Every structure is written in structure tokens, then in C-alpha cells.
């Protein structure tokens, strides 16, 4: 058991978890966000989104001053008070967005895989795909260490594409709505472990951790967290963990921010 008073870190996915997948509303989670903020519990956003997108959302949600994990763990945006850490303000894992884009363009030209990346279109098109404003959609294109795409080929070709990426030291990851290509060494789990270790080094005590997510790309994060909330999501693959002990893992009945609130209610209000 744990409480909101003890050293605690909360890691949360965004789309489909803290944010509604369609409206991006987060108000059902607002009371818990306020309570965590008042208790000085860091809520660390962890998403496939770019750092630019997440900094905007972090401010909107009132969660400034703590680190965040962007681009599925390929980018760690450091906390404001961590200016002495090498790499400040961001730590980039693996190869850059530009290098990944070159690899993808070569595979598309030479092996004729069919996909559309966010680099292939303008912000108006991304706004149509996502329901974001054009200014917010423009932030989705500011990748530093990954590429986001829509797959437009067969499942068989996807398997071939994934194998080719793996040969080249890259991974192909499914998010709530889009696919993401990033360095094979990067991941939400790696980024979370680094942040946990940093907090432990600064405080002298390992914090208890709680994570929330709804998609397959959240599984690595939830595997390394002490307690996990799997928010009911839209993805047909769902989230499957190696350790689904009910004492550690709670699957919500509700979706999005209502599921987020349900998960917090389960692990805190019941204790």
C-alpha cells in the first residue's frame, strides 16, 4: 500500500488517458491533478507527442516545473531545477529525427513501402487528422528523435517493414492512433527509469511510482512502474503486461480522463 503523502511520482500518458481521444478534454481528471499538485507530487507526462506539444500541454494542465517524457521516451525534457545535468534542457536518445527520416525515405523509394509521415503533409492536414488547431498541429511536426506516420500498406508488408527497421537499429511502435519510428535503444521505460533514478539521487530515497496508459506503447512504461492503471482505450491491441497482479494493476471501466480519475480513486481513495 502507499499514500499520497509518501515520496511519489505519477507517470501519465496523454491521448486516450489523461486527455479524451477526440475532444482532448481533461476536466474529469482536474480534481486529482489539483490534489496531487497541492501534495507536491510530480505528475510526469509521458507520450509520443513532441516536446514542444507537451510543454504547451504541461502549462495548460498546471504541471510545470517537472520533467516530461516525449516521443515515446526518445526525448526527456528536464525539470527546470535540473540545469546542472548534462544535456539540459533536453536529453535525446539515439539517432535524430532527420536521420530517421532519411532511412524512411530510402525504404519508401527503394522497397516501395506505403506510408505517410507528418513530414509529408502540412499543419492543416494534421489538424484534419487530429482535430487540433493549426497552431497546435504545427507543434506535432517538431520531432527531434522520432517520426510519426500513418501506415497505408498491408499487414504482411508491415511485418517486412518492421524487420527492416530492426535491422537498421530502429523500432516501429504503435500508439493510440498513429505509428512511430524511433531508435531501438529508446523507450518510455528507459526514460522513466532514468527519471526515477534522478529523483532518488536528489532525495536519497526511491519514490513509489504510479503509471497510467491506454495503448500498446505504454506497456514498457507500465512494466517498470510499481503500480499501473490501464485505462480502457480505443486500440484493438490493448495493453498486456507480464505482471498483472491485481494488487499492482487496475484496468478501468471508463475511458480517457474519466478512467484516469477512476484509477487514482482506486489506488488512493480505497486506501
UniProtKB/Swiss-Prot annotation:
- Cofactor(s) for this UniProt protein: Mg(2+)
Reactions it catalyzes: 2-O-(alpha-D-mannosyl)-3-phosphoglycerate + H2O = (2R)-2-O-(alpha-D-mannosyl)-glycerate + phosphate
Q: Active site at which residues?
A: 13
- Which parts of the chain are coiled coil? none
Q: Which GO terms describe its biological process?
A: mannosylglycerate biosynthetic process
**Sequence intervals crossing the membrane:** none
Q: Does the keyword Glycosyltransferase apply?
A: no
Kindly give the Gene3D superfamilies that the UniProt entry links to this protein.
HAD superfamily/HAD-like, Putative mannosyl-3-phosphoglycerate phosphatase, domain 2
An annotated GO cellular component: cytosol
The alphabetical list of record keywords is:
Cytoplasm, Hydrolase, Magnesium, Metal-binding
Tell me where it resides: Cytoplasm
What class does this enzyme belong to in the EC scheme?
hydrolase
- EC identifiers of the protein: 3.1.3.70
Superkingdom, taxonomy of origin: Bacteria
A GO MF annotation of the entry reads:
mannosyl-3-phosphoglycerate phosphatase activity
UniProt: Mg(2+) binding residues? 13, 15, 214
Q: Does the keyword Hydrolase apply?
A: yes
* Principal subcellular localization: cytoplasm
Q: Which family does it belong to?
A: Belongs to the HAD-like hydrolase superfamily. MPGP family.
Note the NCBIfam families from the entry.
HAD-SF-IIB (TIGR01484), HAD-SF-IIB-MPGP (TIGR01486), MPGP_rel (TIGR02463), PRK03669.1 (NF002976)
Name it. Answer: Mannosyl-3-phosphoglycerate phosphatase
- To which species is this protein native? Shigella boydii serotype 18 (strain CDC 3083-94 / BS512)
